[in-house]
Amino acid sequence: PTVDEREMWQVSMRHIAHEGRCFVVSACQVQDSPQSLGVEIANWPADRPLIAGGSVIVGPMGDVLAGPLRGEAGLLTAEIDTDDLIRARYDYDVVGHYARPDIFELTVDERAKPGVKFTA
């Protein structure tokens, strides 16, 4: 996904981890204000960075394990327990009672296709 320093980014990372029952490591950059980079943007406060970071490590149930790291470059670390993946999937029913093989079918087309297709 696109880099985003706002709180919504943190919420999105937590949701992705929870929905996928997986660990998420989100590394976000830090950049000074546009003015300090020689770029003038109308109404941009000189003390506001272009990107303020927000790197975070999230567990499979959406819990923040490290971060978010904002306003500075740094290294986030977290001790993870891969058994958390198993525990997180106890209530993760991807093919359970609401899967309807009697009315839905998943077909995967394995033929190679171009990434972009131009039509007239």
Segments from the language model and where they lie:
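CN hydrolase (nitrilase-like) catalytic-core segments centered on the catalytic cysteine
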Residues: 1-76
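A short, polar/charged loop-to-alpha-helix boundary motif
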Residues: 72-90
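Cysteine/selenocysteine-centered motifs that mediate thiol-based redox chemistry or coordinate metal-sulfur cofactors
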Residues: 29, 85-120
